[in-house]
Amino acid sequence: MGAYKYMQEIYRKKQSDVMRFLLRIRAWQYRHLNKLHRAPRPTRPEKARRLGYKAKQGFVIYRIRIRRGGRKRPVPKGATYGKPKSHGVNQLKPTRNLQSLAEERTGRRLGGLRVLNSYWVAQDSTYKYFEVILVDIRHNVIRKSGSLNWICKHTQKHREMRGKTSAGRKHRGLGRGFHYSQTKGGSRRSCWLRHNTLSLRRKR
């Protein structure tokens, strides 16, 4: 096994003494930094490389902090209107995962860069910390690379907003087969719509 494989195995054993100490120190360090800040290099190089990161010009790593927990519905004084079924305010769970939310917030703040992917680095009782891999599409190294210039296309603008990253595809239910997550037809919505639309075909 190469060095990256050993690093991957170390990260899988998060309850070991080494990892517990390391993650605790990192969470303490990140807690004292800004909510969104640039990291000089990937904290987990083996994970970053598996997600497409290259140690070359045009690649940037940003670290972001996301508050853990459920999502409170943003309604004034709890006035939701409608039926009692939709009166919930406090104990709602977001449809999207926190990693996807981290990518979106990073993409909003850094609109000139493209979000490639992201990964978990640490967490404590209040926050989760993610590192987001971003690409500068105006850099000649990226534009001239045959394996990387696909992200320069205009169809890849704000891909994190449209569920195109790994975290986004996960919360959309893609990647595990349509039998698992009812996504036959491309998405959960299209599958639900087809099953709930009455189609009376005219006999000719």
UniProtKB/Swiss-Prot annotation:
Pfam families in the record, alphabetically? Ribosomal_L15e
The record's annotation in SUPFAM superfamilies points to:
Ribosomal proteins S24e, L23 and L15e (SSF54189)
Its cellular-component GO annotations read: cytosolic large ribosomal subunit
Q: Tell me the GO molecular function terms.
A: RNA binding; structural constituent of ribosome
State the Gene Ontology BP annotations: cytoplasmic translation
The UniProt record lists the keyword Iron:
no
Query: Region Disordered: which residues?
Result: 71-91, 159-182
What are the UniProt keywords, alphabetically? Ribonucleoprotein, Ribosomal protein
**PANTHER family per UniProt:** LARGE RIBOSOMAL SUBUNIT PROTEIN EL15, RIBOSOMAL PROTEIN L15
Q: Which family does it belong to?
A: Belongs to the eukaryotic ribosomal protein eL15 family.
Q: What is the protein name given in its UniProt record? A: Large ribosomal subunit protein eL15
Native species of this protein? Faxonius limosus (Spinycheek crayfish)
**Upper taxonomic classification of the species?**
Eukaryota, Metazoa, Ecdysozoa, Arthropoda, Crustacea
